[in-house]
Amino acid sequence: VNYDGQTDITATSLKTFEQGVVVVGRAKAWVERDFSYDITGKQDFMDAVAAQVAEYKDGIDQDTILAILKGVFAMNSDAKSKEFVSKHTSDVDGAMTATTLNTATNKACGANKKKFSLVFMHSDVSTGLENLNLIERLKYTDKDGITRSLDLGSWNGKLVVVDDDLPAEEGYFDAAESTEGAVKVVANDATPSAGEIKLSAVTPYFGGKMLAANMYVVPGIRYTTYVLGDGAVSYEDIGAKVPYEMGRDPAKNGGQDTLYNRWRDCFAPFGISYEKVSQASLSPTDTELADGANWVLVHSGEAQAAKRSYINHKAIPIARIFSRG
């Protein structure tokens, strides 16, 4: 208001935003029979199992994070959540190019694109970028002053993590009749000849058109690349009452030992709330984490979406890129 000695000052209050987080519990057991120990020259397989526990847990936690990201990008409960999915997803018509990453991060976060620091991609995508000399290998200097290249690389200054567990889905893309490998779409009641495919068989379809007979598609693989920034996903080791324990059954299979492992973790994507709309037990499965109905953009909590205030989606350094290589 105008401070003129006669205008009343109007007070306003801040809204409180709410974020739901979820604890994910997982368990695993490994067993070794006494007989295996006896017939292998006293080889203790349980020692080998113990050495693999951390690696196994890392793999399970990675699956959990990928399921969470899938769920985040499947949000559809309100307009603002859908806007996040749209603005933070870039669909490349073909393989990655030199400008793909910069364009995608700018689309997602605008001036905040500088927050992005990690790129998770499939090896096929990484290979394509390497062939374009877009991946720069990190270097280190040893104690003798010799500079060597590391296996780790960076793209536009962002660390690249290569993992073939990233989604790579076979499906169909839009094409022209002249496109190499293109097939013609025919009606479902037609008998396809060479170079043709029934409309109902074009699945999954990655194009953006309303498919109909006499159109053309081309089979291919759609790769999903995730770009994350500092603080994109918060992590907390919640712990279990008994994380590790050994059990012995002297009768089963002539005697056997079992190593039990339990753990509970919390992965919370910044600016995204877990709502537990569809969850059968106290710990969500990866399928439930991947369900977009369980996620929503953080907001002020009003029952009606029209009355809510939402976090600015540009503050969330999470982006997704679809490409064909």
Whereabouts are the PLM-identified features?
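Short acidic-hydrophobic, aromatic-tinged amphipathic segments that line or gate anion-handling sites
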Residues: 161
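Glycine-rich, aromatic-lined ligand/substrate-binding cores of catalytic
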Residues: 197
